[in-house]
Amino acid sequence: MTKMMKAAVFYGKHNVKVEEVPVPEVKENEVLIKVAYCGVCGTDVHIYEGDKGCAEVHPPKILGHEFSGVIVELGKGVTNRTVGDRVTVDPNVLCDSCPACLSAKGHFCEHMTGIGTMVNGGFAEYVAVPVKQTHLVNAKTELIKAAMTEPLACCLHGIDMCNITAGDSVAVIGAGMIGLIMVQLARISGAGYIAVIEPVETKRKSALALGADEAFSPAEISEDELKAKNFNCVIECAGLIKTIEQAVRIAGNKATVMMFGLTKPDDAVSLKPYDLFVKELTLKTSYINPYTQARALKLIESGRVDVSSMVQPAIKLEELAEVLASAEKRAKGKFVVAL
């Protein structure tokens, strides 16, 4: 008899149903994971809204790419994991043979498979993944924290590209989970001053608690006052046209502007090349998590980065569709599904 499991299946725009589906069969070099927690990402929201995420999704599909759990079955070719291992998963499966992979640019892999986008992911009781995608989680680390490894890994790639040096002044626009992680990574990177721009008071307080020196409401500080701080780096984490444009305006001379927040695919910003020219600005973007998953897990396990204070109480799988549909609910913090 086929074993069944509960999963949230995406059928298209605004259509997610919790159903009984077959437990996936494990291939030779795969492991079967009993999912413990799976985070709700902005990419999941884009997909739910019918936008393009970081990969094409062809329904029906089980979404969810930020997850942790326990290995319950091994494929015949797996020798480096055991049943009972606690793991988190890098959802981006590389071919390891295309020109991008062979030149250490695997996030541009020509044959990448995305777990939770292109193939079934973690919004289910069980998921089968290639063993090479798993990272062992130590016994002291809660699996709900380990589920946050993937978003932290993405942030690490972004912060690496910012080239922050000791004593730099950094602005972070937006203090959702990603912004709060960026505050902590900027501090670890040596920033001497970190300012956060965020309209929600509770999020500003969280930013201060996690290492920001000052946190401003955009309604309470002028752009001229922000410009006077001569930021060496501005990290935009809201993914809005107006905040991307603001990031360029408040950046100091020779600053790096990291456009980290994910906009909708058809969004366009209005920038004046002359403004970039006279300040010699460097504009950068950051795409997923190339080779940063292991580093991210170490930061979580060591406690150097707090990934839990911004997480809301875990929700049930049956509540996922409501969270995906409600921007107001998501504004309260990071949501994680407990399986």
At which residue positions do the language-model features occur?
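NAD(P)H dinucleotide-binding glycine-rich loop of Rossmann-like/cofactor-binding domains
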Residues: 95-173
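Short glycine-centered segments of the SAM/dcSAM-binding site in methyltransferase folds
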Residues: 86, 169, 255-256, 282
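Glycine-rich beta-strand-centered segment in the early N-terminal region that forms part
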Residues: 22-38, 52-99, 138-141
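Glycine-rich cofactor phosphate-binding loops and adjacent beta1-alpha1 units
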Residues: 162, 205-280
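N-terminal glycine-rich cofactor-binding segment
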Residues: 9-25, 42-73, 88, 106-120
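Conserved beta-strand positions in the Rossmann-like core of class I SAM-dependent methyltransferases
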Residues: 194-195, 258, 284
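C-terminal hydrophobic helical "lid"/dimerization subdomain
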Residues: 2-3, 245-249, 290-339
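Mid-domain Rossmann-like dinucleotide-binding core that forms the NAD(H)/NADP(H) cofactor-binding site
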Residues: 141-220
